[in-house]
């Protein structure tokens, strides 16, 4: 780590360049490590919000599942199918939330590693890609989370730019995209298994996760 970068890491620049105001308009100023710590805290806050949303969906899931079982036991298949369709949509959102949470957890772990190793550019580039993907998935479920994740992504992008200028390192976009896709794929796989383990299967003949029952003509 160069002396210039080490100083920027812990203390920040003492001089104010002419372009400071322009830079501050697109990314927060200041030393890198506190900005990383801020990003970690903001992501952890989003994880907490996702946990609360997951709890709400879980309660709704249990309620609808009970109605499905009741309708099924009374051989009221049209009513059971209506509830099953609703439950299928809820479980898709639950899976989306779980996927986002797991991906954000991986980003937090990486950011905390960066604070120890100073490997800013190569670690943060995949993190930004993951945030963009998670953000797009949250658009229809939590618009406020979409906005916050976009701001966090901008914060990390600013850190990457500053770190690159200080160290002379450049982003390997191919490697960054591969790493980001690996994180997202692993999160999706784990999320799917967690949903299966968490919630009971529907009675035979009714839709499972991600499926919808045919509507009555």
Stretches found by the model and what they are:
Residues 56-64:
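Extended, amphipathic, non-transmembrane alpha-helical segments
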Residues 1-52, 121-217:
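Long C-terminal interaction segments enriched in charged/acidic composition
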